[in-house]
């Protein structure tokens, strides 16, 4: 949806008025990302060295799907690439799920390279408020009212 430069405030207005949706809060995003698990990653507290990870694949793994792109317990494919940041709700531009590849490019290795993809990684609050079209993505949330509703029984149909 984003194909031209846009500030975070402009994007939030667009999302609310054009799509009738909002961004998840950082806590909601972490819950969705973790699939309800309490471990560092949805599959456990570490990385299995047999996993096929984007940016760390070997020659023989070319063309095979990446393990982290598989859907989690909620059926979501989320936080599978440390280069991709997901926008979350905040007063200023706030992201979860990646660091733009800083740890990977910095040579930190797979575990620290993928640590920003953990649901327990602290959200990054950025000062520039400019959405980067190559690295920033969003997951719209349509909120459903869950309180204040009451059931009305139509006695004429009984």
Question: Which residues make up each language-model segment?
Answer:
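Functional-site microenvironments in short loops/helix caps that host divalent-cation chemistry
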Residues: 1-107
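Disulfide-stabilized, aromatic/cysteine-rich ligand-recognition loop
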Residues: 1-16, 21-24, 95-158
């Amino acid at each position: 949806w984003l194909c031209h430069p846009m500030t975070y405030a402009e994007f939030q207005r667009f999302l609310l008025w054009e799509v009738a949706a909002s961004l998840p809060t950082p806590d909601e995003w972490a819950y969705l990302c973790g699939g309800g698990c309490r471990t560092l990653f949805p599959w456990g507290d570490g990385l299995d060295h047999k996993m096929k990870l984007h940016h760390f694949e070997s020659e023989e793994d070319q063309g095979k799907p990446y393990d982290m792109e598989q859907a989690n317990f909620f059926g979501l494919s989320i936080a599978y690439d440390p280069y991709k940041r997901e926008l979350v709700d905040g007063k200023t531009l706030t992201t979860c799920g990646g660091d733009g590849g800083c740890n990977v490019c910095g040579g930190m290795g797979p575990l620290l390279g993928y640590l920003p993809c953990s649901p327990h990684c602290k959200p990054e609050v950025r000062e520039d408020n400019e959405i980067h079209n190559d690295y920033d993505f969003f997951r719209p949330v349509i909120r459903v009212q869950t309180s204040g509703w009451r059931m009305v029984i139509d006695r004429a149909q009984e």
